[in-house]
């Protein structure tokens, strides 16, 4: 199966028969080609060079009267391949699995495709996350924690506050601290924005020492683990889980222990463009009757 992301400027064009026919032509060529594509636009120019597609793209742009661009495509193969379109084609998902191809496997992969549409995982499993990606995730998590000092472990926070009180905070914020320090849970409700920003600056300045702290390290690892569960498909909680805990991996295992997902592709209208944040998860879950 092949999935193609084609961009146009208006919804009117998306419903245009000429446009739709051309998109199908690209999809057919992608399927026939030896090129495999990729999520970052790999092989797009090479595919456009096949069978006159580049010239067709120019011609269709002139005919329709709007700029058309072909951004990416991906090919998916497996013992069983299922697709799912959500929201009149706003989101498209293709999932490929190996190890089983009966009706139960197809139904399971269809459910997983709906899960992918709703929850937008980035990887099949945590094993697919590269060392570089994990390092970047850790860096972001560390900086996020340091820039939210109210969430830091108390021993670290207390050291930062001691520095802030000693000549960094304004007299007003120092007075607030002295008044509220007996109940630190409410301190940040009263501190000024400047005082909070100054604490974050102190934390970033002392980053190396804080990162070396075992308590902080545990906090970061916990947050990373939570994020990995959100971006790894098999680690996500299955949206139809009756107990609210069953993971996608456990769901597939309950259907057929040999059924394995080998690839999935998720395309969404407007990817790479500014768009409103919409609760697709709730919408898809409703369709799944959960």
PLM segments and residue spans:
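N-terminal assembly/interaction segments in proteins that build large macromolecular machines
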Residues: 2-3, 7-290
